[in-house]
């Protein structure tokens, strides 16, 4: 616990595991920061009866720490002992699961704490980079990409194949920023099993548009591994895809024909226009067998087979002389590092949980932990490719 008794000045960190809990206890400000480590697996609140949930050691300790009581007769949010409840979990799948579970618990049992803005999620850094004696903490993969570009951009020149400059002075940073956004879209498409090159090839220059729908045709028997992925501009095109599939497979039930919108399409069209304004055609995004540009790195020529190669090269140059440490868990940080990055109020980053965040967590948890098999199977099918950086 902490020494402060004024809830408005007190913070409770709910920390995953003993190792991170130990570092947090040593690194915190004992005056107003309390730490509650969650040990072992938290109770599955979806399937457990209410009385059984209350008897869980983990949930019981949490309720005691909060001071609000629980249940119709005892719960009183005005008795909350901390006006900042900060969920601090690892940046991996287990951490996401625990965070989802805790948000579900607060949403179902103590919604007023979320409504009053008392629940937060800590944003610890994912990386620490070091060059010579300089150290820097990095929030996430996109932040790392930006930093590597900053470090590498001055040492790379982009050339046409005849050796002339392919970019005006000062335009490299602009191009790389656009290419980062395109890369982000390509990764999102890959998670939806959409081949990015094939998607770009469907660009309609006359109408300045890209396909808006992804259509999945699943063979009989639910054979998801052999599903067909189609792209469509219109409802009429989707209807034609269904007709063609039914001509081959017979009538399709709703579980065999699914579609969703590709919300990133309008943004990608805008990025195409930005690249064209800088003198790059859309085909330059597509890899082929021959170089289309080259880069000069310290006098050495490097072939570029697509614009994305330029982005990769600049980041590779930015890595030179750099030590990059990825934190698989909060327990890998010593108390001083945890204080500096995640506990210290003037430097840390917190996300305040909004009610719609908790609603989404509740819905996700209901799907994953409930007794309904079909929604869970559909969720896993849709999201299996979304999991990155698995620590196994």
Pin down the residues of each PLM region.
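Conserved phosphate-chemistry cores used by DNA topoisomerases
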Residues: 1-392
